[in-house]
Amino acid sequence: GTSGQAWHQDCPPDDPKYFNVNRLIYTMDIDKEKTGGQTLVMPGSHLKGLIPSMSEPFEEDKKVVLSPKKGSIVFLHGHCWHSVLPVTGEYRVSTNYRCASKGTPENITDIGIYRNIRYQFSTSSIVEERS
């Protein structure tokens, strides 16, 4: 198993016209009993801007739990607030293909926005602490 993934956005929502789209393809059933690792999403959050920091109100009770079946595809807007629950089985498999509209910066997903940090993947470094 793994510890899952904290609430985050895949790219900065600074400019709403620039974002990526994740296409998550599931090659196995993802469910609470067998695998864990369900994806949590906050409906409509792709329109709300920056995910709240740890000190700001966060209405987690409004989340939707996705438990895709084998062969399912999930489209996820890069500004959508989402997380992954801990994997409780041996493993969880999905394939993520990303795309973006023409004109979107190629490095749009280099900065991930978490509730406590902004993280730059290309340098493996925290670029901003959020409180």
Each model region followed by its residue ranges:
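Catalytic core of non-heme Fe(II) oxygenases with the double-stranded beta-helix
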Residues: 1-68, 104-113
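Residue-level detector of short, conserved catalytic/binding motifs and their immediate flanks
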Residues: 21, 72, 93
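Short secondary-structure transition/capping segments
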Residues: 30-43, 76-78, 121-130
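Conserved metal-binding segment of the jelly-roll/cupin
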Residues: 67-82, 97
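Non-heme Fe(II)/2-oxoglutarate
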Residues: 80-131
